[in-house]
Regions:
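Glycine/threonine-rich beta-strand-loop-alpha-helix active-site module
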Residues: 1-78
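Carboxylate- and glycine-rich phosphate/diphosphate-binding segment that chelates Mg2+/Mn2+
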Residues: 52-143
C-alpha cells in the first residue's frame, strides 16, 4: 500500500522526487491524485487511512515517512478474510501495532480531543479482548 501511495505522490506531482515529501507540510499537494484503492492484508498500520507512507531510501538504507494529500485512499477495502492465513506471529505483531497506535493517541501531546481519546480507549478494549482470540483461532472473523 505504501508503494502505491508513494507512486501516486510522484505521478501527480511532476518535477519532484519522493524525498521532497519527507516534510509534507512544506509541499502541500494541489493535485487530487489518481483514484487510489487500498486493501490491507494485515492489521495494525492503518496505512489505508493516512496520508503518510513509509519508503525505503536505498541510498541511505533508511526507512522514512513521506506524506502528501495524494496519498489518501479514495476507497479502503478492509476484509478480515485476507488475514486468516497470516502466520500467528504476524497476526500478533500487527495487532500490537494497532494497540500502540491507540496508546500513542492517548499519550500524544498533539491534537488530543474527546473524540480521539474515546476512540483510542475503545480500540484498546477491542484489541485486548480480541487479539488473543484471533491469534489462537485465525478463522474467528468476529475477533
Amino acid at each position: 500500500m505504501d508503494t502505491a501511495k508513494g507512486i501516486n505522490i510522484i505521478v501527480n506531482n511532476p518535477g519532484k522526487t519522493i524525498a521532497d515529501y519527507l516534510d509534507p507540510s512544506t509541499l502541500p499537494s494541489r493535485n487530487p491524485g489518481a483514484f487510489l484503492i487500498l486493501c490491507p492484508t494485515t492489521t495494525g498500520t492503518g496505512s489505508e487511512m493516512t496520508f503518510a507512507s513509509v519508503i525505503h531510501f536505498m541510498d541511505t538504507d533508511r526507512k522514512l515517512s513521506v506524506g502528501d494529500g495524494t496519498a489518501f485512499a479514495n476507497l479502503a477495502i478492509v476484509d478480515p478474510v485476507l488475514t486468516v492465513e497470516l502466520p500467528k506471529d504476524v497476526t500478533a505483531y500487527t495487532g500490537l501495532d494497532a494497540l500502540t497506535h491507540c496508546v500513542g493517541c492517548l499519550t500524544s501531546i498533539y491534537n488530543v480531543n474527546p473524540l480521539s481519546e474515546a476512540l483510542a480507549r475503545d480500540g484498546i478494549g477491542i484489541i485486548m479482548e480480541n487479539l488473543p482470540k484471533v491469534v489462537a483461532n485465525p478463522s474467528d472473523l468476529e475477533a
